[in-house]
């Protein structure tokens, strides 16, 4: 059964979701569409899954298009946003979701590793906002993507955590910049969301688990620290984004949201809630 929404606060709006072809990005794109938005789905390499998201959106009667662009190349970001405006005629909502995760021992970390992570997780988000500013409609919304990892001390995770920590500073300053156009800028810091990235690295955060642990064991360990006793799914983040993109959030600006109820492993192995 197709899941549709009769409340359409985003009807007539156009959204761009970077990294929207899979995982959290796909969940965000679908939730925006369920609330009436037309959606441009940017992807880097996942053409097949991006097209599947497009088809799922079209199946509920919304418009969607998939656009390939490597956001580690800054000129591609400007071209992407221009293409969205050419295709739909406007731009109202920008969700900067593209990102990558890397674990590497400090003693093995190179400049190439640094550039690889920061070029996508940090620089690209800055320039998505920069070029969105030129085209976004008055009253528009920009939502950046951080991570709860920015506030945790996980071995071998300094590059990822640092690249996401910068987003909080971006958010507060960009909120002031975009305020001149009547637009808001907020950020989300997810954790424990079941996606392809989660499947690869969740064992590193799960108390009592290691690389040999099954996904069921990892999920049980992580969910046990949540008052809701479950891990998040991409649609959970999509619903938070949809709220921030809606008229109800017009007085929410420069804020940093961490939807999951727990903050991760403490030195003793317990989860901080």
Curated annotation (Swiss-Prot):
Organism superkingdom: Eukaryota
Keyword Oxidoreductase tagged: yes
Stated regulation of activity: Tricyclazole and pyroquilon inhibit arp2 hydroxynaphtalene reductase activity.
The protein's enzyme class: oxidoreductase
PROSITE patterns linked to this entry: ADH_SHORT
EC number(s) on file: 1.1.-.-
Record-stated family: Belongs to the short-chain dehydrogenases/reductases (SDR) family.
Keywords attached to this entry: Endosome, NADP, Oxidoreductase
Binding site for NADP(+): 24, 70, 97, 130, 160, 164, 193, 195
SMART domains: PKS_KR
Taxonomic placement: Eukaryota, Fungi, Dikarya, Ascomycota, Pezizomycotina
Enzyme active site: 146 (proton donor), 147 (proton donor), 160 (proton acceptor), 164 (lowers pka of active site tyr)
GO cellular component terms listed in the entry, alphabetical order: endosome
Single GO term (MF): tetrahydroxynaphthalene reductase activity
SUPFAM superfamilies the record matches: NAD(P)-binding Rossmann-fold domains
GO biological process: melanin biosynthetic process; pigment biosynthetic process
Protein name: Hydroxynaphthalene reductase arp2
Annotated metabolic or biological route of this protein: Pigment biosynthesis; melanin biosynthesis
């Amino acid at each position: 059964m197709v899941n549709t929404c009769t409340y359409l606060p985003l009807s007539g709006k156009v959204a761009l979701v970077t990294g929207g072809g899979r995982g959290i990005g796909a969940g965000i794109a679908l939730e925006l569409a369920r609330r009436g938005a037309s959606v441009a789905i940017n992807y880097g390499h996942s053409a097949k899954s991006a097209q599947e998201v497009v088809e799922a959106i079209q199946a509920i009667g919304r418009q969607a298009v998939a656009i390939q662009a490597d956001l580690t190349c800054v000129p591609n970001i400007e071209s992407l946003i221009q293409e969205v405006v050419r295709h739909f005629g406007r731009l109202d909502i920008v969700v900067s979701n593209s990102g990558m995760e890397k674990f590497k021992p400090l003693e093995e970390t190179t400049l190439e590793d640094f550039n690889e992570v920061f070029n996508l997780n940090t620089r690209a988000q800055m320039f998505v906002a920069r070029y969105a500013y030129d085209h976004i409609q008055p009253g528009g919304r920009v939502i950046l993507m951080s991570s709860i990892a920015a506030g945790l001390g996980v071995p071998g995770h300094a590059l990822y955590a640092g690249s996401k920590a910068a987003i909080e500073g971006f958010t507060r300053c960009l909120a002031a910049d975009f305020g001149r156009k009547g637009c808001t800028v907020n950020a989300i810091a997810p954790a424990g969301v079941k996606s392809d990235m989660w499947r690869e690295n969740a064992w590193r955060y799960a108390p009592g688990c290691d690389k040999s642990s099954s996904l069921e064991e990892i999920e049980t360990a992580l969910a046990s620290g949540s008052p809701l006793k479950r891990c998040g799914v991409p649609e959970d983040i999509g619903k938070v984004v949809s709220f921030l993109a809606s008229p109800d959030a017009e007085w929410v600006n420069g804020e940093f949201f961490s939807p999951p109820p727990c903050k991760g492993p403490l030195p003793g192995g317990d989860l901080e809630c």
